[in-house]
Amino acid sequence: MPVFTKEALERLPIQLGNFFKKFPPENPNAWTTNPNRQNPFLATRNPQNGLVINPYYSNRRQAEIYKEARLQNLDNLLPQQMSWQKDSTRHILKGLLNPKGKISERKRDEILENRRLKLSESLKKTSKFKNERQKASKIAKPSPF
């Protein structure tokens, strides 16, 4: 049973009226992905061959229809909009979570660790060399007394 009469459809803006002529509203829960009642804002799958069918309306046209429907207080009769799902299930981008950075920034920790290891190693070698040098000088020179 249609919700709108012809007079009511004629009073709506052209784009919104055309939408309700093509896809007459029943109730908000009536929009599904079944072939007999497809949501014109969402992509669906053909049950016979499994191919994806693009949405009937683009995101821009969806936004225009929703704006007009909100102005007329009819947005509850429209099917679920594609952009609503995008925001709620959006994944965090890898680049924002772990930014790539420059090579010097990415390898900074590794470079500092290598530098610290080399410095501690060189200090050990230096102290070892000094100790050997002192022992050698004590052995080589007899005490004058």
Curated annotation (Swiss-Prot):
GO terms for molecular function: structural constituent of ribosome. It is found in: Mitochondrion. Residues 123-145 are annotated as: Disordered. Residues 123-135 have a biased composition (Basic and acidic residues). One of its GO terms (cellular component) is mitochondrion. Keywords: Mitochondrion, Ribonucleoprotein, Ribosomal protein. One of its GO terms (biological process) is mitochondrial translation. Belongs to the mitochondrion-specific ribosomal protein mL59 family. Component of the mitochondrial large ribosomal subunit (mt-LSU). Mature yeast 74S mitochondrial ribosomes consist of a small (37S) and a large (54S) subunit. The 37S small subunit contains a 15S ribosomal RNA (15S mt-rRNA) and at least 32 different proteins. The 54S large subunit contains a 21S rRNA (21S mt-rRNA) and at least 45 different proteins. This is Large ribosomal subunit protein mL59. It comes from Schizosaccharomyces pombe (strain 972 / ATCC 24843). The gene is mrpl25.
